């Protein structure tokens, strides 16, 4: 198994975990019937038919459009035909294109294609887009756009709540599935049950190898793409991942580059060994996270905030990161506890910015929980998440080294404006 280089420990990093190489992989085997039931349970249990947008042949077979698409990388699926059809169908006149910084290099090519084949004007939105929570339909509408195409993230914000028409393009990426399967077969014993997940770009590959490995005659593995609704099966976000039954899985495997999203699953499931397969470098590494340090740092922040009298309640204004219902719920609870609350709106939250609020004793941010988890140490005053604020107020379960919830955008999560409880979590 290829391993990542040993990471030199430094005081206070962005993340509290470290990546290490391991020579051995512990495996957990289950009976054939049990494992197949796990795989079957990962499949959709609904028989409802999905509405299919039939793209007209005149678009699918347009030779000029086909030639234009060749200007884009062939292993990146920008779904140009589907985009052209939707823009035409809605008769959109000004279309906003929003994508993460890594894809902006292709934005002008896509813009030219859409303007030529849709008879519309396009606006490339250059502000940072960290995830689907950053979809900025408000700014797009202010710019006079009547349609927005959001690239590389899943449908976290439903299409029926945005202020203008929206199309999500996942930008799925083709990878070497054979190499991924052989890597898993080499590192895990036959019959091992694995939870495999990744970002939305690699979701098709995960589902593809699941079936192939299940029916492999030489080295069968049981692959389960876990799901925490409303995310897709096998999808994970940096703030939202499923709590997995540790007795059912020998390990969890993340398919993707970087650690940010994987860290969510490691925080949520500290007792399950974690591995990462990078489809670009084709390296397979053992990953770890310092749960003790996480608990130590976040517990300290809560204790410091507990005696604070004046709280700055921050609504994240980067796209749709913030949730007004959650802000209102937290304000009500803080005031009921005798705290003074100052409302603040920020698109991005930086230590230097919050340091200017001298009269505020502690902050609560309704934007991204990873801001507090990853960067909380860098702020001169406590910066709590909605969950940690409820813990401080005695209205949610205290975390420990075995459990810290990462369910922010779950259907009943704080990111949805709900007030979840974690009392019954095992």
From Swiss-Prot:
[4Fe-4S] cluster binds at residues 133, 239, 368. It is an enzyme of class 2 (transferase). Its main location: cytoplasm. The keyword Nucleotidyltransferase does not apply. Pathway: Protein modification; peptidyl-diphthamide biosynthesis. It is found in: Cytoplasm. Keywords: Cytoplasm, Iron, Iron-sulfur, Metal-binding, S-adenosyl-L-methionine, Transferase. InterPro entries: DPH1/DPH2, DPH1/DPH2_1, DPH1/DPH2_2, DPH1/DPH2_3, DPH1/DPH2_euk_archaea. One of its GO terms (biological process) is protein histidyl modification to diphthamide. It comes from the Eukaryota. Its EC number is 2.5.1.108. GO terms for molecular function: 2-(3-amino-3-carboxypropyl)histidine synthase activity; 4 iron, 4 sulfur cluster binding; metal ion binding. Binds 1 [4Fe-4S] cluster per subunit. The cluster is coordinated with 3 cysteines and an exchangeable S-adenosyl-L-methionine. GO terms for cellular component: 2-(3-amino-3-carboxypropyl)histidine synthase complex; cytoplasm. Its cofactor is [4Fe-4S] cluster. Disulfide bonds: none annotated. Pfam families: Diphthamide_syn. NCBIfam families: diphth2_R. Belongs to the DPH1/DPH2 family. DPH1 subfamily. Catalyzes the first step of diphthamide biosynthesis, a post-translational modification of histidine which occurs in elongation factor 2. DPH1 and DPH2 transfer a 3-amino-3-carboxypropyl (ACP) group from S-adenosyl-L-methionine (SAM) to a histidine residue, the reaction is assisted by a reduction system comprising DPH3 and a NADH-dependent reductase, predominantly CBR1. Component of the 2-(3-amino-3-carboxypropyl)histidine synthase complex composed of DPH1, DPH2, DPH3 and a NADH-dependent reductase, predominantly CBR1. This is 2-(3-amino-3-carboxypropyl)histidine synthase subunit 1. It comes from Eremothecium gossypii (strain ATCC 10895 / CBS 109.51 / FGSC 9923 / NRRL Y-1056). The gene is DPH1.
